[in-house]
UniProtKB/Swiss-Prot annotation:
Residues 23-51 form a propeptide. It comes from Conus marmoreus. It comes from the Eukaryota. The presence of a 'disulfide through disulfide knot' structurally defines this protein as a knottin. The cysteine framework is VI/VII (C-C-CC-C-C). One of its GO terms (molecular function) is ion channel inhibitor activity. GO terms for cellular component: extracellular region. Disulfide bonds join C52-C69, C59-C73, C68-C77. InterPro entries: Conotoxin. It is found in: Secreted. Belongs to the conotoxin O1 superfamily. Expressed by the venom duct. Residues 1-22 form the signal peptide. The lineage of its organism: Eukaryota, Metazoa, Spiralia, Lophotrochozoa, Mollusca. This is Conotoxin MaIr193. Pfam families: Conotoxin.
Length: 80
């Protein structure tokens, strides 16, 4: 019973994670990987365009990415 509950919670969490990190467009996951490849190729691009958030700003779930200038987020942007 506990294992079943844990599996249900895990599936719900992963579903929410996918919906939160997906683009706002229709079929957002379809075009997600080419964009990620481009950002990996030019890793300084998001920072140079001013789209990153400074340390202390709210950023969402814990994830590495271009959303924070430092690249690390745990509810707020963490300093390096």
């Amino acid at each position: 019973m506990k294992l079943t509950c844990m599996m249900i919670v895990a599936v719900l969490f992963l579903t929410a994670w996918t919906l939160v990190t997906a683009d706002g467009t229709r079929d957002g996951l379809k075009n997600r990987f080419p964009k990620a490849r481009l950002e990996m190729k030019n890793s300084e691009a998001p920072r140079s365009r001013g789209r990153c958030r400074p340390p202390g700003m709210v950023c969402g779930f814990p994830k590495p990415g271009p959303y924070c200038c430092s690249g690390w987020c745990f509810a707020v942007c963490l300093p390096v």
